[in-house]
């Protein structure tokens, strides 16, 4: 009996005991960088496991507002985080911008004619344009705003293929299913051999990525520690490798 008890204890000791499980909801454009951040954080904090949920920022906000168990929220824009704050979903004093990005138009490598300006998107050589749903996808809002500012939205609206997130837009371009797509610079960097950078799109202000601990977090101390890690020199170096700029 004693041997059986010792054997059971040994088996339990062999099973990883996570001191804290963190759930991080992050914008789709953060997929590669945050996975690397999570691995580095777990290595630096043994006993902590970081689980990620990647989707469009607006979709993540809806999930959190409906009670999804989330400890940290990282959005691809300030607007979505503003909405989270207005709904009283964020822990006070935890919101902070941790990275910036840029907007690009990309095209399939095999495209006969690569657009070089926004005006080219209204030309005969471009018939299908991937663009994230402006209602829930920040990159879609940035892109629509740029097209409206250039007076081109009415000309290209009929060519828009609406996507659920920026990675879907990137995939459509990579597979040659569209002639062009709006993505972030970091997304284009993630598939350098499958998409061609056409041109950078100027946007007013900056494309800022804010992060905050949720008010409903069950691991508030660990969540704050993870947020601090993202902003630390090590975290910023990881983000920089994936093409993000410092805020």
Provide a role label for each language-model segment:
Residues 19-45, 49-58, 62-66, 75-78, ...:
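Exported/periplasmic ABC-transporter solute-binding proteins
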Residues 4-16:
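Bacterial N-terminal signal peptides
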